[in-house]
């Protein structure tokens, strides 16, 4: 796809035209030369592509080196013209040139009509200059539209033109406006635009691939739009600031969160440490009495004391705090001991005079008795007086009502009154045991028939197992697979992993007990009676020896103790208390009751009962009783044809049975074994490498330590203060004669 080779720079272009500098005195013919050049570039591009008709490209403004947004110097006066030009540039970027909508009409109207400033400016001369510039600009635009607009034949569109969704919405909103007004708006737009307005032709439906240069240009345009929007907001803010304080603008400012310390109720219960408690203030008790009146008069309030706002502050220290001089702890401790505590300082009257004193209105009062609290300290009397107790007893006597009982006539009869005798219960009647075994015996005896029935032969059904499968032939044993052995002698002695054949779990066969013959009587097997012999424990002798030693020790202790004499009390001879004489009863002769006799009688009774049971069983077995004939009522036996699949059929099977070669299984096992061995070997190598690295690090550390200790470091040469030879300031000694000689006297 052919593209026009255009150049661009990363920085914003500076070849722009400042429309504010244009005056009516300058040459108006060369004003639109820059726009003509850009239009010629676009026409050349269309001719290269082979389009004869005037065609407005989709990306003409994007490819052109057009400055869309520019920065103007700030002025105190409301410059409405700059705002209009910025709005036009923004709308040109957002809306294509071939798209004619209601927004373009609004822009053309706003461009033709001067916008009145919202607030009245102070500088009237600047406003007049601005109006003059706007009039000149309107005249230049009209001249450009007359000169540059060329007549062009409108080509009928080949297909129905598509209308964007935004355009449809705007047309629906403005549907109430007449069609004539829309035509007028379009004509004014074409006049205002000049050469940029070309009759719309439907563009060719082909996908436009944007190059990196075009994408960069679009990005640059978006950034310029953002800059223009920010400039517009800044100018609005500047206007509000210059207008002065008007109506307060409500701003949704979030309040700064103030930190509040936690206040737990449990902290008040904890007793504080004596160091943290408040300082003790010595107060004279007598001087405090009647100092404060019980009902103080409400005085007039003084002036409001100005206090600073409690705003949130950062914890960072300020410059003044940081610049404070450092005081050692020793000096602080010494100053603390020398300083007099605050409780011993007298109050300064000057400070008290500065504070606003509360004016107290003095009112004459009558003397009143003091409100003493001692009478409220007395406890309530809980003990009742005698009068209260007598009143309570009188109430109880009045509430009590006497009820007489009926007269018992037996009182007048002769003889003592005895309680009624309890009714005598009848003696217990013995009831025999109702055993279940006796019931069964009676039932059997009642069911017995007096006459023996004749024996009749009944045939039994043929066993079906003979027809279903082979009976009596053992199953074929599965021979294990042959383990191949290599003929190589080196491999014969190789240790092989023993292969364990998976033993199939054989189902547990429950064999039923054989049915006893009807003619043979049943004899229960009685278990042999074995008497357990009681053997003495092994430590009986040891216990006996301990008992003897204990008794011997007790006797020795008794011999060592000296017996103390204790006199018995004097007996009372008034009454003689003799023990009662015990009279022994006459011996009554009773027969012997030996255990052997009891056991013999019990055994004889059991033997007799057992014989009776055996005789009954023999009689029951001798009486043959045939079972009812149920075979004649059942369906005849029909052997079922077995439905075996082709895979299970040993002969002529079509499906191949799955099998697994022993070599494949051994190969898999070998691979797994080699994999495990390789993992173990890699782990060992990793461990050895880690140990080697640790040893190397230890050696390096040891060498560094030895070098640090062994290498001698010479101390630097000391620099002493230079000796300054100062000349003596004393005057020279003047020689004076001692005058020892007396010749000159």
Curated annotation (Swiss-Prot):
* Any one Gene Ontology BP term: cell division
CC per GO annotation: aster; axon hillock; cytoplasm; intercellular bridge; microtubule; mitotic spindle; nucleoplasm; nucleus
Modified residue annotations for N6-acetyllysine: 128, 307, 375
Q: For the cross-link Glycyl lysine isopeptide (Lys-Gly) (interchain with G-Cter in SUMO2), what are the residue positions?
A: 477, 500, 640, 739
Q: Which GO terms describe its molecular function?
A: importin-alpha family protein binding; molecular adaptor activity; protein kinase binding
UniProt record similarity statement: Belongs to the TPX2 family.
Subunit info here reads:
Interacts with AURKA. Interacts with importin-alpha; leading to inactivate TPX2. Interacts with HNRNPU; this interaction recruits HNRNPU to spindle microtubules (MTs). Interacts with BCL2L10. Interacts with KIF11.
What PANTHER family does the database record attribute to this sequence?
Answer: TARGETING PROTEIN FOR XKLP2 (PTHR14326:SF44)
Described function: Spindle assembly factor required for normal assembly of mitotic spindles. Required for normal assembly of microtubules during apoptosis. Required for chromatin and/or kinetochore dependent microtubule nucleation. Mediates AURKA localization to spindle microtubules. Activates AURKA by promoting its autophosphorylation at 'Thr-288' and protects this residue against dephosphorylation. TPX2 is inactivated upon binding to importin-alpha.
The protein's name in its UniProt record: Targeting protein for Xklp2
Q: What is the native source organism of this protein?
A: Mus musculus (Mouse)
């Amino acid at each position: 796809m052919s593209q026009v080779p255009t150049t661009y720079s990363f920085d914003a272009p500076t070849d722009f035209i400042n429309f504010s500098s244009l005056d009516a005195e300058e040459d108006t013919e060369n004003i639109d030369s820059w726009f003509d050049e850009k239009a010629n570039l676009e026409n050349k591009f269309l001719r290269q592509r082979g389009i004869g008709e005037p065609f407005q490209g989709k990306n003409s403004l994007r490819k052109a080196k057009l400055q869309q947004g520019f920065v103007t110097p700030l002025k105190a006066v409301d410059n409405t013209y700059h705002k209009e030009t910025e709005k036009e540039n923004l709308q040109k970027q957002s809306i294509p040139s071939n798209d004619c909508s209601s927004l373009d009409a609004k822009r053309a109207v706003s461009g033709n009509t001067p916008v009145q400033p919202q607030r009245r400016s102070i500088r009237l001369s600047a406003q007049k200059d601005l109006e003059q510039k706007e009039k000149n600009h309107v005249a230049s635009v009209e001249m450009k539209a007359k000169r540059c607009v060329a007549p062009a034949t409108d080509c009928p569109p080949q297909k129905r033109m598509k209308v964007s969704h935004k355009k449809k919405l705007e047309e629906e909103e403005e549907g109430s406006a007449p069609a004539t007004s829309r035509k007028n708006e379009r004509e004014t737009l074409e006049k205002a635009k000049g050469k940029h307005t070309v009759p719309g032709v439907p563009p060719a439906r082909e996908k436009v691939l944007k190059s990196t240069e075009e994408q960069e240009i679009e990005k640059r345009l978006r950034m310029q739009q953002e800059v223009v929007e920010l400039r517009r907001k800044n100018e609005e803010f500047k206007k509000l600031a210059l207008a002065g304080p008007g109506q307060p603008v409500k701003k949704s400012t979030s309040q700064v969160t103030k930190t509040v310390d936690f206040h737990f109720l449990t902290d008040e219960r904890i007793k504080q440490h004596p160091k943290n408690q408040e300082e003790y203030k010595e107060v004279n008790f007598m001087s405090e009495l009647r100092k404060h009146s019980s009902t103080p008069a409400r005085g007039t309030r003084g002036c409001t004391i100005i206090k600073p706002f409690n705003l949130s502050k950062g914890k960072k220290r300020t410059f003044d705090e940081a610049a404070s001089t450092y005081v050692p702890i020793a000096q602080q401790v010494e100053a603390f001991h020398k300083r007099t505590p605050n409780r011993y300082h007298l109050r300064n009257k000057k400070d008290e005079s500065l504070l606003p004193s509360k004016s107290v209105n003095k009112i004459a009062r009558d003397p009143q008795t003091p409100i003493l609290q001692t009478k409220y300290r007395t406890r309530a009397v809980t003990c009742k007086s005698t009068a209260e107790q007598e009143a309570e007893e009188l109430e109880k006597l009045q509430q009590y009502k006497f009820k007489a009982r009926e007269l018992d006539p037996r009182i007048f009869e002769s003889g003592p009154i005895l309680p009624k005798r309890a009714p005598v219960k009848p003696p217990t009647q013995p009831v025999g045991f109702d055993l279940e075994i006796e019931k069964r015996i009676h039932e059997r005896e009642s069911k017995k028939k007096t006459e023996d029935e004749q024996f009749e032969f009944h045939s039994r059904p043929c066993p079906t197992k003979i027809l279903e499968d082979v009976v009596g032939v053992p199953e074929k044993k599965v021979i294990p697979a042959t383990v191949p052995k290599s003929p190589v002698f080196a491999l014969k002695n190789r240790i092989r992993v023993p292969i364990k054949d998976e033993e199939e779990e054989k189902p547990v066969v429950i064999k039923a007990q054989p049915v006893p013959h009807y003619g043979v009587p049943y004899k229960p097997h009685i278990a042999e009676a074995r008497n357990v012999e009681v053997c003495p424990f092994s430590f009986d002798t040891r216990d006996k020896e301990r008992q003897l030693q204990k008794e011997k020790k007790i006797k020795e202790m008794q011999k060592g103790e000296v017996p103390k004499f204790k006199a018995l009390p004097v007996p009372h001879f008034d009454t003689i208390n003799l023990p009662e004489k015990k009279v022994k009863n006459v011996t009554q002769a009773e027969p012997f009751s030996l255990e052997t006799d009891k056991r013999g009688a019990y055994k004889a009774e059991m033997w007799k009962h057992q014989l009776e049971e055996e005789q009954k069983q023999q009689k029951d077995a001798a009486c043959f009783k045939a079972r009812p004939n149920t075979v004649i009522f059942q369906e005849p036996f029909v052997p079922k044809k077995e439905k075996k699949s082709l895979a299970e059929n040993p002969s002529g099977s079509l499906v191949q049975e799955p099998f697994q070669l022993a070599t494949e299984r051994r190969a898999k096992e070998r691979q797994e074994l080699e994999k495990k061995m390789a993992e173990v070997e890699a782990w060992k190598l990793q461990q050895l490498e880690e140990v080697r690295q640790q040893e190397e690090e230890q050696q390096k550390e040891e060498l560094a330590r030895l070098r640090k200790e062994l290498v001698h470091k010479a101390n630097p040469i000391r620099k002493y203060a230079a000796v300054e030879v100062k000349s003596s300031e004393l005057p020279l000694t003047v020689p004076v004669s001692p005058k020892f000689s007396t010749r000159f006297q």
